[in-house]
Regions:
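A cross-kingdom feature that marks ATP-driven nucleic-acid transaction machinery
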Residues: 293, 302-465
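Phosphate-binding site recognition
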Residues: 1-330, 334
């Protein structure tokens, strides 16, 4: 399955702008491995294209690479290409090429180029304003550093601010899009594939599930020779100068530490140091910072792993390292990995259920403003509680309250009573609509409560309909 699969909407929009024959500056960004370059390559098929992939090196070496890209386009039969003396000269050559004919110019890994040649954004701004705006140039700037792309390309402080004609933030596939890769597998298997890969097309392909998720994990992840086994370490080495500390932070979060103090204690560094590293992990799309829905960032803020593949890897690979090294993982897998998958899938299932409600937002009893989790203290019982799903209204005081259970047991009426109690602790609404999601189904008592209109019940199979 190709990596641009399920990117038809983005591809259609890119092609529509190409047909316009006027200057375009398209910004494409998103975390690594999500399929940005595959999307661009698919779009560029059959179109006159100069594709320049910037290098994490010096400005001079990037100029050499850019020169080669341009000369390869102009004279594909040349064995060696002359180098432009300056970036201005290279950009002027691109101006000449796009003056009369439509041409695509891609700068992939743009943050690398901007780091190597800090003036490049200002140079592009100048040539766009004075030459390319009247040309047939179709410029694509692509990058994986999301904070850089948002601040230094799209942000108001950037020289390029206002020059873009469109931008695409490429996100991982959702659970339904991920399932299209394996239409013959069960809903449970497809949910596991989503939970392991996070909907990243590259990881879906590398996991390569044929008949069994268990077999695919043993062959393509829990094996030292496999691509996915080495992926986290390779990605951290590629992106970061001090992978050891980042590695410790990711491992701490994967093991359940979510508050800054807890992470700091596990890592053994100061809060200020860990905060700095967390910011970088958030920028890379590996970690995320979350606050209870409808509340401002503060003491309740927690850190989670945004990348499901990293979360899975750090949850199950380090603790099974000796079994992997000794070749015993196939024997230990049932009781060291498989039995813990339902627990691991808990957070994943919550996200799937939230996405389900967003899919069918027009059928909900309220006009949905946002959806997320809420956690806080039950002052009467003096304990912490968490509500898996809270849907807030655009206006009024009607809320959606939901519970998500990824387990084989049927869920009973006691779960409805529990989320009613939680709703009263939440306390922001005067009317609540209750939703319970369950992989294992529901008891007769809870089904009867649904018949009385007290609750909406959704199974795993319902999510995939």
């Amino acid at each position: 399955m190709s990596q641009f699969y399920c990117r038809e909407n983005e591809l259609r929009k890119l092609n529509k702008r190409y047909e316009g024959d006027k200057f375009e500056c398209i910004v494409i960004y998103g975390r690594r491995r999500v399929g940005k370059t595959a999307l661009i390559n698919e779009f560029c098929k059959g179109k006159p294209t100069i594709f320049f992939s910037a290098l994490n090196t010096t400005g001079k070496e990037n100029l050499e690479a850019l020169s080669k890209s341009i000369m390869t386009f102009e004279r594909p039969d040349m064995e060696s290409a002359p180098e432009f003396r300056s970036y201005d000269a290279a950009l002027d050559e691109l101006t000449a090429l796009s003056k009369e004919k439509r041409m695509v110019f891609v700068i992939d890994e743009y943050p690398y180029l901007a780091k190597a040649k800090p003036a490049i954004s200002a140079m592009l701004q100048h040539i766009i304003d004075h030459k390319w705006m009247e040309s047939k140039m179709y410029l694509i700037l692509c990058g994986s550093s999301m904070s850089f792309m948002e601040s230094q390309v799209l942000g108001k402080e950037s020289p390029l601010y206002g020059r873009r004609t469109a931008q695409f933030k490429i996100a991982p596939l959702d659970y339904k899009e991920t399932a299209v890769f394996h239409p013959n597998l069960s809903d449970e298997d497809n949910s596991l594939i989503y939970g392991i890969t996070g909907g990243v097309p590259h990881y879906i392909n590398k996991l390569d599930v044929r008949d069994s998720v268990d077999e695919a994990l043993l062959d393509n992840l829990f094996d030292r020779s496999s691509y996915l086994y080495e992926e986290p370490a390779n990605l951290l080495k590629q992106e970061l100068r001090e992978p050891a500390i980042y590695n410790a932070i990711i491992k701490a979060i994967a093991e359940g530490a979510s508050r800054l103090n807890d992470i700091t204690m596990k890592v053994g560094e100061e809060n200020s140091v860990v905060s700095k590293y967390l910011k970088t992990l958030i920028d890379l799309g590996i970690a995320k910072k979350e606050t209870p829905i409808s509340e401002k960032p503060g003491k309740k803020t927690i850190y989670l792993l945004a990348d499901n593949f990293f979360r899975f890897w750090y949850r199950f690979v380090p603790v099974n390292m000796s079994a992997i090294d000794s070749g015993r993982i196939a024997k230990t897998y049932p009781h060291t990995v498989k039995q813990y998958l339902p627990d691991y899938m808990g957070l994943i299932f919550e996200k799937m259920c939230q996405d389900y409600l967003l899919y069918y937002a027009d059928k909900l009893p309220i006009e949905l403003n946002e959806i997320g989790q809420w956690w806080g203290t039950d002052s009467k019982k003096k304990k912490q509680i968490q509500i898996d799903i809270v849907g807030t209204p655009v206006e009024g005081k009607e809320y959606i309250i939901g519970s998500c259970k990824y387990r084989n047991e049927k869920i009973g009426v006691d779960e409805l009573e529990l989320i009613r109690d939680y709703a009263s602790v939440f306390g922001k609404g005067n009317t609540y609509h209750y939703y319970i999601f369950s992989k294992g189904g529901f008891t007769d008592g809870l089904l009867q409560a649904r018949e009385r209109g007290e609750v909406q019940l959704i199974t795993l199979e319902d999510l995939y309909k």
